[in-house]
């Protein structure tokens, strides 16, 4: 399998394969927070994120969600369909936390009556600014039809994920998704789903996600290992 580096990100490297429509995502042991300001190498993180994301994407595929995931090929690598990423971070919030609480001056932990979908312009130089539908169209990131589909699909994914995490005693607080266009021009779910890009709280309100690293609350891999062990209990 020919492996040439296409892109090196904070959490993953993207490599070519012999098929121009398939790439390898190689998960790193690097942890970052605050848009890369806080950075640390944490042994075992890449393997855990690859395991967790592979399992979640397998379940999403089985539930009828169109994703880029093909299969896990090693402890830290997976095969994905190549997509043209839409430079949007799509955030869904079930409970107030993090930047939402800071932005609106509300305490963390308030259950929202209806999940809120937010868009952020994926641009490191601009610190990924919070934008609305009109900005998305002005920047020509997506049209009305694309926006409606992305929002509806994000809400559908939220229902699936919230149920799965509830089954293993975890509450899905919020999460970030990325979408892209496949070779046929269809929008599909891309990137990853792991404790790196979601918030999970246990029954006691303990953080079971990257906030452990972001806020200096403990060992990241210890928490991710617990999430991985719990996920394997899913039917």
Swiss-Prot record:
Residue intervals passing through the bilayer: none
GO BP, sorted A to Z: 'de novo' IMP biosynthetic process; cobalamin biosynthetic process
Substrates-to-products reaction catalysed: 5-amino-1-(5-phospho-D-ribosyl)imidazole-4-carboxylate + L-aspartate + ATP = (2S)-2-[5-amino-1-(5-phospho-beta-D-ribosyl)imidazole-4-carboxamido]succinate + ADP + phosphate + 2 H(+)
InterPro entries per UniProt: SAICAR_synt/ADE2_N, SAICAR_synt_PurC, SAICAR_synth, SAICAR_synthetase, SAICAR_synthetase_CS
Keywords attached to this entry: ATP-binding, Ligase, Nucleotide-binding, Purine biosynthesis
Coiled coil: none
SUPFAM superfamilies reported in the protein's UniProt record: SAICAR synthase-like (SSF56104)
GO molecular function: ATP binding; phosphoribosylaminoimidazolesuccinocarboxamide synthase activity
EC id: 6.3.2.6
Origin superkingdom: Bacteria
EC class (word): ligase
Record pathway: Purine metabolism; IMP biosynthesis via de novo pathway; 5-amino-1-(5-phospho-D-ribosyl)imidazole-4-carboxamide from 5-amino-1-(5-phospho-D-ribosyl)imidazole-4-carboxylate: step 1/2
HAMAP family: SAICAR_synth (MF_00137)
Family in the record: Belongs to the SAICAR synthetase family.
Name of this chain's protein: Phosphoribosylaminoimidazole-succinocarboxamide synthase
Gene: purC
């Amino acid at each position: 399998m020919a492996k040439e580096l296409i892109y090196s990100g904070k959490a993953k490297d993207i490599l070519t394969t012999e098929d121009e429509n398939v790439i390898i995502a190689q998960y790193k042991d690097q942890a970052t927070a605050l848009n890369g300001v806080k950075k640390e190498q944490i042994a075992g993180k890449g393997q855990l994120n690859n395991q967790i994301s592979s399992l979640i994407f397998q379940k999403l595929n089985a539930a009828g969600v169109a994703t880029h995931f093909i299969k896990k090929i090693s402890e830290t690598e997976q095969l994905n369909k190549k997509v043209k990423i839409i430079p949007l971070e799509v955030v869904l919030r079930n409970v107030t936390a993090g930047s939402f609480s800071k932005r609106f001056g509300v305490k963390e932990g308030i259950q929202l009556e209806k999940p809120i979908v937010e868009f952020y312009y994926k641009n490191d130089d601009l610190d990924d600014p919070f934008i609305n539908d009109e900005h998305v169209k002005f920047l020509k990131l997506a049209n009305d039809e694309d926006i409606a589909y992305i929002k509806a699909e994000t809400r559908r994914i939220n229902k699936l994920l919230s149920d799965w995490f509830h089954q293993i005693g975890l509450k899905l607080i919020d999460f970030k998704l990325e979408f892209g266009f496949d070779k046929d021009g269809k929008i599909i779910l891309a990137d990853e789903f792991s404790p790196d890009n979601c918030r999970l709280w246990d029954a006691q309100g303990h953080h079971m996600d990257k906030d452990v690293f972001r806020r200096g609350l403990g060992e990241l891999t210890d928490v991710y290992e617990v999430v991985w062990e719990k996920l394997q209990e899913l039917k």
